[in-house]
Curated annotation (Swiss-Prot):
InterPro entries in the record: DUF3846
Protein name: Uncharacterized protein y4iR
Family of this protein: To R.leguminosarum PsiB.
Keywords: Plasmid
Superkingdom, taxonomy of origin: Bacteria
Length: 161
């Protein structure tokens, strides 16, 4: 029997079920994450999260906030059942229940334009000119994929409905 894992990609916000071959150690997890150095953190008493240990780096365009962890998580995340040692097993938690613990985040730049009343020490600036860019962090729930269809769309309560 094949084991499955849940894979979260903060770039796309997709949280989906993927097959993981039995008896092959952590190699499939490294492959799913696309990295060579992996960190493991506890999801709950029965599950573990694997992530790229170097995922928080200069130039990231997306990251994940995990409710039970004090800092953002960079890169893809794999959720499995077990304590991180081998063997690992398919999660016993539903993907929908796991998803509520994550927020996919990305920085967004909002333009700030000059108003009619704005002036500088060197003189008047024309209204409508770009004055600044403000940075904010957009947080979105993961978009669930169960391997067959978009779970949110099927339930009628997600971003794609």
């Amino acid at each position: 029997m094949k084991n499955v894992a849940y894979l979260l990609d903060p770039e796309t916000t997709l949280f989906r079920t993927v097959e993981v071959a039995d008896g092959t150690g952590l190699a499939p997890i490294f492959s799913l994450l696309g990295c060579r150095l992996v960190q493991m953190i506890r999801f709950d008493d029965s599950h573990a999260l694997f992530l790229d240990d170097e995922g928080l780096r200069d130039g990231i365009t997306a990251f994940t906030v995990f409710a039970s962890y004090p800092q953002p998580l960079g890169g893809k995340i794999v959720l499995i059942r077990g304590d991180g040692s081998e063997p690992h097993f398919s999660p016993s938690i539903k993907i929908e229940d796991a998803a509520v613990h994550f927020k996919c985040c990305r920085p967004v730049l909002d333009p700030v334009f000059v108003t009619a009343d704005d002036a500088t020490p060197k003189g008047l600036i024309l209204p409508g000119a770009l004055a600044d860019l403000k940075v904010r962090i957009e947080q979105r729930p993961p978009m669930l994929m169960d391997g067959r269809h978009d779970v949110y769309r099927a339930r009628g309560d997600g971003l794609n409905s």
